[in-house]
Amino acid sequence: MADTQTPNLQNTAEGDANTSAENERSLTVRANHQSQNTRSWLRYPFLVAGIALFLGPFSFFWPREGPIDSKDYVERTKRVLKTTPLIDGHNDLPWQLRIELHNRIYDGRVDLSKKLLGHTDIQRMRQGMVGGQFWSVYVDCDTQQQHFEDPSWVVRDTLEQIDVTRRFVNEHPEHLQYCDTPACAREAFKSGRISSMIGIEGGHQVGGSIGAIRQMFNLGARYITLTHNCDNAFGTSASTVAAGGADQGLFKLGYDAVKEMNRLGMMVDLSHVSHQTMRDVLGVTRAPVIFSHSGAYAVEPHLRHAPDDVLRLVKQNGGIVMAVFVNRFLNMKNPDQATIHDVVDHILHIAEVCGWECVGIGSDFSGTPFVPVGLEDVSKFPDLIQLLMERGATDQQIRLLAGENILRVWGKIEQRAKELQAGGEKPIEAEYEGRNWHKGMKNSPWMLRRSRDEALVNGAADQPFMFNVDSEGKHNPVVKQV
């Protein structure tokens, strides 16, 4: 048999008794300890209060985030631009992509996230604390078209510019976000991205067509400059007047264009237009207007700027004038001597006449070879803000200037469009006088006798008409020898 040890029942009973006693003592100790802890916690607030009273006089030694010195313009600027998006109303980078790369952005020749020549790249936008950017999809107008009958290449090129803008924005999702609403622009800023919007720089880019305006809106454009440096079907440009031409203001189709843009929620941009065109638009628009890159005529009498009477109308309208950075607009006699101080002068004058609620920033970077000293590229926006602070601008005024104004104006334009559409307003059906509707007309049946007669009057008599309507309203085939 194996040698085993039988447990001692007496020892086991005594052990159980000892264990029970120890457990009781342990419970008593824990209960007393918990009671003491409870009393300690009850006394804790009074202890903290006592310590705070004792150390209060010495608290200035502790590091903490407090009010910034009003003359610490660098820190004030950082604080403002970290919480309010700085939105630039006009940048022509897409034009550079067109001219230099023929819109080929995938072949490795350019990386927009790294520093490039010129004024604009994402690296310097980040340095400049840019929070939003309206990209201009500009296409030039090189003739004063009198009949506006050959716009096909301009409209085509505009479509290509919208395309390349959307593509380069999509290529950098960590930095850029395409937006077509002010709500999107705010959300992009909160997420750390630069909101990217599209503006069309000239009514010639829609070929004088209100239908094309609607389609550009559907493609994502959110403002149209009524004219660029040439007259178009909508109105007179500042360049025409500067060259000695008559200021005829807004043309008949221009009134319809403004009305339709109001209905759509497309911002009407009055940069580049003549002074009378500015006044005419402000007299008929049903929504706020913008000047995406202009200045104050009273500061520098260039026709690209808004006179004081127009600034007062903009105030009544609830619109915005975004200050431009182009040398020759800032100092006509000595463009090379233009500086950042000239831009500040324009901003402060606009604010004085129109109010801080209607001033913004519209640089025109990458659209001009010559910019003022101190504003050499997109990294320099904070320097402008600091100088404005030095000249007396408050943080709240800077917030309005930087981005709150354009977002508010844009929001009002959106709201007005919703009201007009909810009221049953239909899309405008209008065209410029002299429009030829019968180029390349196909052999096709006519719905109305009137249409056939109009075609004959308009010089389409050599076209075959497949059907006619007789006096009894019956459709009879008409075979015309050709």
Curated annotation (Swiss-Prot):
InterPro entries: Metal_Hydrolase, Pept_M19. SUPFAM superfamilies: Metallo-dependent hydrolases (SSF51556). It is an enzyme of class 3 (hydrolase). Zn(2+) 2 binds at residues 201, 272, 293. Residues 1-24 are annotated as: Disordered. The chain crosses the membrane at residues 41-61. Its EC number is 3.4.13.19. CDD domains: rDP_like (cd01301). Its cofactor is Zn(2+). Belongs to the metallo-dependent hydrolases superfamily. Peptidase M19 family. This is Putative dipeptidase NECHADRAFT_87110. It comes from Fusarium vanettenii (strain ATCC MYA-4622 / CBS 123669 / FGSC 9596 / NRRL 45880 / 77-13-4).
